[in-house]
């Protein structure tokens, strides 16, 4: 509920709900409650994720199932039941926090189960964007170029030292905001990188997004080799 409190302190309105995206009935109920409270649903962000960076040999099936139920299936279920609400509004967007479909061995070999689950979210983008294009519902993916200073990085993927090589979550928030302010029919089926998309929208200074400006930034997983950072900008 802390996120809801922060939203309301900033002048927004929030409806905090405890939702397990693996439970279809709970998802449907949450969407209905949200639509009733706010008069509709304009935007859906699929960000729920489970992670285990383990090899096939070291991944137990319970962990495998959890990642696929939350990442791929959860994204599918939430998006599926949000469609009837989104079709009723003027500028509907579905956004997955998932990577470009760069299907390379290097992304799978160290952690096949996680990569399958994460790319599963992106496959929903690929299919659903085509399915909903004629209905004017935008479906896109957003992925960070660098690691982002989140609890997952701090607690699971490198600790405080790694956090210093990250950008702040603000860059993803700003990129998402720019996506949602774009007419849905003009932006769909895209796999967007945060700083590249912001650069396309006129942002040229990315220095303030750094956690520690003195440290080199660390790249995130799944970044395609041909995805160059924006030219001539302060990263």
Segments and roles (model prediction):
Residues 30, 45, 78-82, 86, ...:
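Hydrophobic positions on the long internal alpha-helix
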Residues 18-30, 61:
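The beta1-alpha1 cofactor-binding region of Rossmann-like NAD(H)/NADP(H)-dependent oxidoreductases
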């Amino acid at each position: 509920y802390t996120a809801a409190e922060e939203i309301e302190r900033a002048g927004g309105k929030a409806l905090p709900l405890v939702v397990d995206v693996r439970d279809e009935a709970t998802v449907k109920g949450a969407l209905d409650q949200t639509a009733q409270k706010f008069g509709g649903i304009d935007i859906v962000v699929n960000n729920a994720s489970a992670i285990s960076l383990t090899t096939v040999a070291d991944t137990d099936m319970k962990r495998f199932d959890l990642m696929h139920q939350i990442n791929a299936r959860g994204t599918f279920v939430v998006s599926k039941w949000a469609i009837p609400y989104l079709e009723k509004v003027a500028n509907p967007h579905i956004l997955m926090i998932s990577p470009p479909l760069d299907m390379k061995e290097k992304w799978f070999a160290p952690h096949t189960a996680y990569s399958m689950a994460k790319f599963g979210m992106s496959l929903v983008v690929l299919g659903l964007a085509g399915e909903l294009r004629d209905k004017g519902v935008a479906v896109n993916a957003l992925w960070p170029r660098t690691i982002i200073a989140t609890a997952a990085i701090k607690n699971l993927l490198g600790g405080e030292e790694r956090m210093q090589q990250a950008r702040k979550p603000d860059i993803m928030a700003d990129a998402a905001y720019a996506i949602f302010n774009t007419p849905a029919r003009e932006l769909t089926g895209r796999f967007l990188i945060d700083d590249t998309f912001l650069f396309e929208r006129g942002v040229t200074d990315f220095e303030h997004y750094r956690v520690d400006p003195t440290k080199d930034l660390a790249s995130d997983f799944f970044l395609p080799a041909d995805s160059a950072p924006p030219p001539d900008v302060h990263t």
